[in-house]
């Protein structure tokens, strides 16, 4: 059998790993083994944080909606409940956008939600 020489492929692979590890601190950008380990970790973090980003944005939207709702004399929970009872379907991303950029439209939604809520706020909502 013919002998297989791998120096070209091995150097290419190492060069690609070190190129992608550019910007890391210390040995992680210069030594192949350290760079390879760091690349594996970074891919794991990248995957995890793509999932976490969705939760973080949802939390941010809820905080913005709650702040806008409290300026209109409501809480976030009552606003969402009122919007459901009024059969107004607006997602949290757009509600937060309205609360920040178009407060008059957000106030109109709050008024519609208030009107749809039952008189006794402590009573369970009609389903």
Curated annotation (Swiss-Prot):
InterPro entries for this protein: Ribosomal_bL20, RIBOSOMAL_L20_CS, Ribosomal_protein_bL20_C
Disulfide-bond pairs as recorded: none
Pfam family, one: Ribosomal_L20
Biological processes per GO annotation: ribosomal large subunit assembly; translation
Protein name: Large ribosomal subunit protein bL20
Record gene name: rplT
Chain ranges passing through the membrane: none
SUPFAM superfamilies: Ribosomal protein L20 (SSF74731)
Family: Belongs to the bacterial ribosomal protein bL20 family.
GO molecular function: rRNA binding; structural constituent of ribosome
PROSITE patterns in the cross-refs: RIBOSOMAL_L20
Summary of the function given for this chain in its UniProt record: Binds directly to 23S ribosomal RNA and is necessary for the in vitro assembly process of the 50S ribosomal subunit. It is not involved in the protein synthesizing functions of that subunit.
One GO CC term on file: ribosome
Taxonomic superkingdom: Bacteria
Species for this entry: Corynebacterium jeikeium (strain K411)
Keyword list, A-Z: Ribonucleoprotein, Ribosomal protein, RNA-binding, rRNA-binding
